[in-house]
Each structure stands twice: as C-alpha cells, then as structure tokens.
Regions:
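Interaction-mediating elements
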Residues: 1-144, 148-149
Length: 149
C-alpha cells in the first residue's frame, strides 16, 4: 500500500498514530467496502486529534491491477483542504480547545451548578479538538434534563 499525503503535518501525525491501527494489509482480498471503512477510520482518527474540518472526502484510493497477476496495488491519497469559494488548497488546520465556558439562556442564569456541568463535559482546555469528546459531552448533557443545546 502506498501513501500520497499532501499535508506534511497530517503525514507526521499519521506516522505516529495510525500505523498501529492499519486494517488494510498486504495480501488481503480487494474489497471496496474495506477501502471505505478505512476512509472512515482515518477520518475518525484525525477528527479526534484536532482536525475539526476534516471529512472522508479528502481521502481517495487508486487501484492498479497488473495484467496477468491477481494482485492490486492500492494507493491512498489524502488531499489538502480547499476553503469554500477558493481555488487554492491549504494545509488542514489542527484546532486546540482554548477555553470551555458555560452560559445561561435568556436570563443568563445557568440551570445547573457549574460543577455538575463540568462533570459532564468531556472537552478540555488545551487539548486538541476531539469529535468523540464532543459527542460524549452532548450525550452527557442530554441525560441532564434541565439542559437544552
């Protein structure tokens, strides 16, 4: 399997995080569903490591079969970010949580104590954005019936 990652910061992060989790292995039968599952896994790894705007459409594969052989060479391509209304590609931005604040509704009062809210918040200041932590926070808040978000 070959990798064509056009963003050096993601390439470095992938080398540290991802090789331990590789699902696609040399000698596996070619399967489009497995390639799509790999795209989703890589997307999950990156959105849990600061890349808020990353989605699976940045990842594509090319498959090259050798005539007479029963082998397929796979290349994974990870493209740069293209902002809306732009023709220029840029590097993907990695986001870090700056601060976590709780604000009340129309009257400005919080429906619960800050301690209760903090105990149910998985997002932490100074850590990279993590979509799993965001979902866990939403789920925890959903169980607190006094909260609407």
């Amino acid at each position: 399997m070959a990798y064509d990652i056009k963003d050096d910061s993601i390439a470095a992060k992938m080398e540290r995080i991802y090789p331990k989790r590789m699902w696609l292995k040399k000698g596996m039968p070619f399967n489009v569903a497995q390639l799509d599952a790999e795209r989703k896994r890589i997307t999950s790894v990156l959105t849990d490591n600061g890349y808020f705007h990353f989605h699976k459409d940045f990842i594509s594969f090319t498959a090259d079969s050798v005539k007479g052989e029963k082998l397929v060479n796979i290349a994974l391509h990870l493209d740069k970010f293209r902002p809306a209304n732009s023709t220029c590609d840029t590097l993907h931005t990695s986001y870090t949580i700056g601060s976590v604040n709780f604000t009340g509704g129309n009257n400005g009062k919080l429906p619960l104590r800050k301690g209760t809210l903090a105990e149910n918040t998985w997002i932490e200041e100074g850590k990279p954005f993590c979509s799993t932590d965001l979902k866990r926070t939403y789920n925890s808040f959903g169980k607190l019936q006094a909260i609407r978000y």
